């Protein structure tokens, strides 16, 4: 009997739109990395830091189409990823500035996001960041990102019982299970799109 073919390892670039150290959205992404290590073979979540990116300014681009070193390094990580998991906080009903800045830098010149799958998780007040998710999906249309539709995860972070500890780490087991379902959907969708290539 032949051994089953090994599943390819799918590299998930996890990008948090909040730069705050104890960000709840960062906590969701850390939990996602832990869930993958514990229970989802073939899926690896790598955090991609966007805090060092300069604000988008095309004057920083070189005459031959080059970018500042921090931007080049970020674009390389985006290109190397098989798919993306965005932790998208909601600021004033929309996407946080650091995340929009990262999206814009990696779309300059050759669009590094194009034709790759993605998922969004968010945490916050009100709708749990849900409105930022819809704006991110709208931006993704132009970037040719392919978002999973379901399941959605928007955590109402300030409702009781507490969902996060004082360091922003997820402590809610039910939300952790919901993150797992998002990741399984992203994994299946990524494999499906890769088979079409």
Swiss-Prot record:
Cofactor(s) listed in the protein's UniProt record: FMN
Catalytic activity from the UniProt record: a quinone + NADH + H(+) = a quinol + NAD(+); a quinone + NADPH + H(+) = a quinol + NADP(+)
InterPro entries in UniProt: Flavoprotein-like_sf, FMN_Rdtase-like_dom, NAD(P)H-dep_reductase
Annotated GO MF terms: FMN binding; NADH:ubiquinone reductase (non-electrogenic) activity; NADPH dehydrogenase (quinone) activity
Keyword Flavoprotein appears in the UniProt entry: yes
Top-level taxon in the UniProt lineage: Eukaryota
One Pfam assignment: FMN_red
E.C. designation(s): 1.6.5.2
Record keyword Chloroplast present: no
Classification via SUPFAM superfamilies: Flavoproteins
Keywords assigned: Flavoprotein, FMN, NAD, NADP, Oxidoreductase
GO cellular component: cytosol
Function: The enzyme apparently serves as a quinone reductase in connection with conjugation reactions of hydroquinones involved in detoxification pathways.
PANTHER family assigned: CHROMATE REDUCTASE, NAD(P)H-DEPENDENT FMN REDUCTASE LOT6
Family stated for the protein in its record: Belongs to the SsuE family.
Subunit structure: Homotetramer.
Protein name (database record): Probable NADPH:quinone oxidoreductase 1
